A protein has these predicted regions:
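Conserved nucleotide-binding/hydrolysis micro-motifs of P-loop NTPases
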Residues: 12, 113-117, 144-149, 217-220, ...
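Switch/communication elements of ASCE P-loop NTPase nucleotide-binding domains
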Residues: 1-66, 303-304, 308-448, 452-453, ...
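Short alpha-helical segments and helix-capping/turn motifs at coil-helix boundaries
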Residues: 6, 89-95, 122-127, 186-201, ...
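Short glycine-/polar-rich loops that comprise or flank the Walker A/P-loop
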Residues: 103-107, 134-139, 206-210, 345-346, ...
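Glycine-rich phosphate-binding loops of NTPases
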Residues: 79-81, 86-102, 108-248, 437-441, ...
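Membrane-embedded alpha-helical bundles of multi-pass transporters/translocases
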Residues: 39-111
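Acidic, divalent-metal-binding catalytic cores of TOPRIM
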Residues: 415-677
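Extended helical coiled-coil dimerization/tether regions that scaffold
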Residues: 207, 215-351, 376-381
């Protein structure tokens, strides 16, 4: 039994669509046959930029599972939990005297059932029709008004067609917020089955246990000691470790010895003093109250050594301290249930943004470190921890860690902004694989290539896929000098033209604007290549570029190609006419757009001094660069990186910016137009 899906309807940033989170299955943190543990493959990831809605998922689970009680310390629903766009629509409806819908927040929890396993589903009995043997069960939770007529009358008095206007709709919004806040006592969380029948006397906390490890828990100088204390205390409670630690009888013996000494030394004198000042028969006895927890917390001190030198705890690295705090919380939770007991609950462990304080390498290895630590700490246990781990992050390194350690894109939920609302997209291998087959080389390439900046796609405002090394070197500089693009996170992913297609499905799922900058790769015959013939037209020409072929109706012919290709959020850019010629590479485009530019000429001369003199002549005629641009392309074929670095050096040391080739400029304009919407 496990949480399979979780839909949030009109809760905070989540509206009525694109609002479902998918979770990994119920295998939980279990040992394989070889005794190893792999948390990555059983971890659900919530990824996205800051303020996208990742924490909202945790807050919803926390309020649903842990907040449905009368305790003031428990998380409660408030007006701020309602989706603001939803409230605005309701205000407009009420302003037109339509009161059919009252403000509510809804959740749908899909519970997966493991066939053939001993799932104890007594808590789900009321949700299962008699004689029905389902693979999954849906629970509908609704936070709604109980006394609806009273609430409706209040709304009618404050917001109606006589009061509501375009000019005062903001005032009406605040009126509704006030009504909701004043009626929170009139709201109740109710549960329904798939047929809309209310299920009474049901508590979600009897079915689900949600344990949250919050971000940035390194708040004091003794956090590391507290983490170790927690681990040792948990291990001490386990029968496996009981004989190797201080037993209760040992501690009781110490308490008795202390009591005897205290009473012998002090109690008689104190009691004589009390008798002398009061008529009542009052005496006092000193009792020792030493416990294992008090010993660990207050008496035992940790000393840390590094290269035989003692290191104070407050000088220990914050990243490693944070990692140990997370591990200690996990172990503490795992020790909650004895090995012999059967846990009939769905156990959710939420880890919020664990990358806090961690350097990139530690983030990259985060999941493997968790694996190793838990495996060592639980190596003498036989228990299977029936838990699902949910991890939120805005670290591309942790995304890499999940994909590479788990070998899959499954259970990655991408959360992004969709206007003022959040948008959740659940990824999996079948959705991302170019042809739906996860065993083919293209998909294997994605999983391996994702470590080379591809995971930045999950956190970028836009992306540019480039053909080669020179573009990857120079485009970041061009972007940094663009006053619009330099305010956004534009990730540049180096990948050749053919392999750009591999990312097609993933890019469309993410829905960020993406430009693919590729070479037109015009086919030349042998004589044209040998004579360095310039291209002036693509009529009756073919290309060898697989990306262009794909978007050109599977045709290599350039005869009907008049403009760039666009497909949903993807646009493919390739070279067009530049100063009378059509370049066929990025380097040739740079030369044609800047044939008489001093910075470009200096870079050409530094890269290929003999060829430079041969082409421009004596005296120097810059026009020769333009008329021999393809020759330059051929001569630079083995020195593209050197040319790009020389050009970058010249631009940075002279604070110069060169003319962008037309197709690069068009690519930037496309990204800007999409980001402005």
């Amino acid at each position: 039994m496990y949480l399979k899906k979780f839909k949030l309807i009109n809760f905070r940033k989540f509206a009525e669509n694109e609002n479902e989170i998918e979770f990994t299955d119920s295998q939980g943190i279990k040992k394989a046959d070889d005794g190893s543990i792999n948390i990555a493959s059983t971890t659900t990831l919530l990824v996205g930029k800051n303020n996208s809605g990742k924490t909202t998922v945790f807050e919803a689970l926390d309020k649903l599972v842990n907040g449905n009680s009368d305790s003031n310390s428990k998380p409660k629903f408030t007006f701020d939990d309602f989706n603001y766009e939803y409230i605005k629509k309701l205000v407009e409806e009420y302003g037109n005297d339509k009161y059919d819908v009252l403000p509510s927040i809804e959740f749908v929890l899909t519970i997966g059932l493991d066939k053939g396993k001993d799932d104890l589903i007594v808590n789900l009995g009321h949700f299962i029709p008699i004689g029905y043997d389902p693979d999954e069960i849906k629970i509908f939770a609704k936070y709604e008004v109980v006394e609806s007529e009273i609430f409706k009358e209040q709304v009618k008095n404050e917001i109606n067609s006589e009061i509501y206007t375009e000019d005062n709709k903001i005032d009406c919004f605040y009126k509704l917020s006030k009504i909701i806040n004043e009626n929170l006592f009139n709201y109740k969380l109710k549960y329904y089955d798939e047929n809309g029948n209310e299920i009474k006397k049901f508590k979600l906390s009897n079915l689900i246990d949600f344990f949250k490890i919050q971000a940035n828990k390194v708040t004091t100088d003794d956090c590391l000691s507290a983490a170790f204390n927690s681990i040792i205390t948990a291990r001490n409670k386990s029968d496996k470790f009981y004989d190797t630690t201080l037993t209760e009888s040992h501690i009781e013996g110490i308490n008795k010895e202390l009591e005897d000494k205290f009473n012998t030394a002090h109690t008689n004198e104190i009691n004589r003093t009390l008798t002398s000042i009061t008529d009542n028969d009052i005496t006092v006895k000193l009792r020792a109250d030493l416990t294992f927890e008090k010993i660990i917390k207050n008496i035992v001190k940790y000393e840390y050594k590094e290269n035989n030198n003692f290191v104070p705890e407050n000088q220990f690295g914050l990243g490693y301290t944070n990692l140990m705090v997370i591990i200690s919380k996990l172990v503490e939770y795992m020790e909650k249930y004895p090995e012999s007991s059967f846990n009939s609950k769905i156990n959710l462990i939420g880890i919020e943004e664990p990358e806090t304080y961690m350097h990139p390498q530690l983030q990259e290895l985060f999941i493997s470190h968790i694996n190793e630590a838990i495996e060592i700490l639980l190596q003498q246990h036989e228990k299977n921890i029936n838990s699902q781990i949910i991890l939120s992050t805005h670290s591309s390194h942790i995304v890499n860690s999940k994909i590479h350690s788990g070998g899959t894109f499954n259970s990655i939920n991408y959360i992004s902004a969709n206007g003022t609302n959040a948008r959740a997209v659940s990824l999996n291998d079948n959705k991302i694989s170019p042809d739906g087959e996860t065993e083919k080389d293209d998909f294997k390439f994605i999983k391996k290539h994702v470590i080379f900046k591809a995971s930045d796609l999950f956190f970028a405002d836009a992306a540019i896929l480039v053909e080669g090394t020179a573009e990857n070197i120079l485009l970041p500089y061009f972007i940094s000098n663009d006053n619009t693009l330099n305010k956004k996170f534009i990730t540049i992913l180096p990948i050749n033209g053919a392999h750009a297609l591999v990312y097609n499905n993933l890019i469309k799922l993410l829905q960020i604007p993406v430009s693919i900058i590729t070479d037109i790769d015009v086919v030349r015959n042998d004589s044209e290549s040998e004579d360095f013939k310039q291209i002036t037209s693509i009529k009756d020409r073919d290309t060898t570029n697989e990306t262009i072929r794909y978007y050109n109706n599977n045709s290599y012919s350039l005869n009907d190609v008049t403009d760039y290709f666009e497909d949903e959020n993807i646009k493919v850019f390739f070279q067009k006419e530049e100063n009378g010629y059509i370049p066929t590479s990025f380097e040739e485009s740079i030369i044609l757009a800047n044939y008489d530019n001093e910075v470009v000429n200096s870079a050409l001369k530094s890269t290929k001094p003999r060829i430079y003199t041969e082409i421009v002549g004596e005296p120097v005629n810059y026009k020769n660069n333009k008329d021999n641009s393809y020759k330059w392309q051929c001569k630079l074929s083995d020195d593209k990186t050197k040319f790009a670095n020389e050009l970058l050096y010249e631009m940075m040391t002279t604070d110069s910016i060169i003319n962008l080739p037309n197709y690069i400029k068009d690519s930037f304009d496309y990204i800007k137009s999409k980001l402005e919407k």
